């Protein structure tokens, strides 16, 4: 009897501390689909998350409201066009504030390629482009060549070949407390990482780990194999909560 009561007590404490994660079905994930996204990018990440059991919903400019962010487990900013400012120009200042407040108060942000640029201070021709400013660092191009290619990265100390097109490089010197998941093997720049923003977390990935086989075919690239398992491992870690956050109002 004592052992049973102790077990129940342990389960209760774990649930109250957020140690037991919600099932995927209970987690709503918002995926931006609007001006500034590339063809097939929102759909690729949505398909992957839906197959994993998550409740995915597309969201467009005019819909980044406080109401829509309620009970949201993660916001996804997928890959986009060569001009990341298209997204910024499509959103109102209040919508950007709502997004930042959501993350600051314990939400999760996943930025892939263009979404990674938008997470930090994006540099184009030595000019700083306005962004979400969720990362305290500048974000530059990993390489100037705009063509799709197979890029080599070191993911958790294992070399991988992944789909890449005009992806961002993250300045690790400005992110001393970040959880570094991947670097580009040629330059050593950050390719994937998770960093705190207020009480929330920001996960950014330069390469397109959500790419499907048709992406390789359309670009006349020989597929090295899909990277979906890497992306899902990253997302599952991003979604984990080790404590319950106290809500704080973000000003500005």
PLM feature segments, named:
Residues 27, 100, 207-252:
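Extracellular ligand-binding/catalytic regions of CAZymes and related secreted enzymes
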Residues 5-16:
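Bacterial N-terminal signal peptides
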Residues 19-21, 26:
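Boundary at the C-terminal end of the N-terminal hydrophobic targeting segment
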Residues 144-215:
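Catalytic beta-strand/loop cores that center a nucleophilic Ser/Cys/Thr
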Residues 36-37, 81-83, 116-118, 139, ...:
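Short, solvent-exposed loop/turn segments at secondary-structure junctions
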Residues 38-123:
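Helical hinge/lid and interdomain linker segments adjacent to catalytic or ligand-binding clefts
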Residues 120-161:
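Class I SAM-dependent methyltransferase SAM-binding "motif I" and its flanking Rossmann-like core
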Residues 26-38:
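Short hydrophobic beta-strand segments
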